[in-house]
Amino acid sequence: DAPLIIDEIVMKIDSFKKIFEILNETQRDIITIGEKEIVEFGTLYSLSAVNSIAPHYRDITDPDHLFGFVFDCHLTLQMRDKLLLFKSNLATPKRIFLTRKSTKKRHYNESEVWGVLKEYGFEVVAPETYTFCEQMALFNNADYIVGGSGAAFTNLLFCHSGCKVICFRSIRNYSPIFSTIANIV
């Protein structure tokens, strides 16, 4: 069997590493390649990307940027089902308000929103403080999720079909990434 060649960052980020370990069902050998490393191969097999979504759009005014997305719903759901087999048994809240533990300030009135949501039984959650398997459980068990747009919303993939979500985002940067994920679940 040919080994799998991956970017070394996959093995340095716990959630990426866990996803890779789960999906590497054949237990192929792994060769990691550094960011600026140049490698020559005799024969190289390349896998097509399941999804191709360009990250980190900033101040997009041209709607044509939306045409660069490729999203295979069927394969994404297959991957979701495999990954959910490894979700944590952690007891998690049904109503979650997503925040960031880092000191990076959100660009909306987060404290005022929290003031309203706590009256409705929401709990503040910083997804980056959970393991990948715990994040799957957190989102899969939630009935309501509210928060500012960010990477944590990729976990919408693991929500159950009845989950209700409010995602605050800038009106200047429209991207259908999270709504596309939510619609396939």
Model-derived regions: residue spans:
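The feature primarily captures lumenal catalytic ectodomains
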Residues: 1-185
